């Protein structure tokens, strides 16, 4: 089995097992479909289909943290769709739309990045807990996927330690611990 290309089917099936309500399954299937469409042809870390990342973010929340919340899982699946395309997420409900909007990092040039990141993480630290959960699960998957990519990992690790670790500590001890372990494993 090629993990990079088979993961979307198996990973999504595994995600759905946590939800018994038919309406939840339909919502998750629609969100997964849109995320798959938006990210078609895109690679995460230049090495695997981008949808794998979105699925792992949802799985971190649903399986690792046991947050069995359909709208939160939909937001996790869709968390990078606003960055990739100008999608209207209102059809997924106001809560999903606001979580994704809050978790979306602004696109900036390299010169503006430090200042904008400072503002962004200040804003997200004041955002509802759901948005912080999605952002933290997103970063946790990003850190975990940096193993073996030393050049890129150094900058990502520094940014994570400066902005994301304090956010994790203020949001959920379990996420803070998982993030600390993932950062340690980058050494």
Residue ranges and their predicted role:
Residues 1-187:
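Active-site helical microenvironments for divalent-metal-assisted chemistry
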């Amino acid at each position: 089995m090629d993990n990079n290309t088979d993961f979307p089917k198996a990973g999504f099936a595994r995600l759905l097992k946590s939800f018994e309500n038919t309406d939840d399954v339909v919502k998750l299937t629609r969100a997964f479909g849109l995320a798959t469409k938006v990210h078609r042809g895109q690679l995460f870390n230049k090495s695997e289909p981008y949808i794998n990342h979105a699925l792992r973010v949802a799985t971190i929340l649903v399986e690792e943290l046991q947050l069995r919340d359909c709208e939160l899982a939909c937001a996790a699946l869709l968390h990078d769709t606003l960055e990739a395309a100008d999608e209207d997420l209102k059809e997924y409900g106001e809560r999903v739309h606001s979580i994704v909007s809050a978790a979306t990092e602004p696109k900036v040039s390299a010169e503006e990045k430090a200042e904008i990141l400072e503002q962004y993480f200040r804003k997200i630290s004041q955002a509802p807990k759901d948005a912080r959960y999605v952002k933290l699960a997103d970063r946790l998957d990003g850190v975990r996927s940096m193993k073996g990519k030393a050049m890129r990992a150094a900058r990502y690790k520094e940014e994570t330690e400066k902005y994301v670790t304090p956010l994790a500590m203020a949001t959920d001890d379990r996420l803070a611990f998982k993030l600390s372990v993932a950062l340690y494993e980058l050494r």
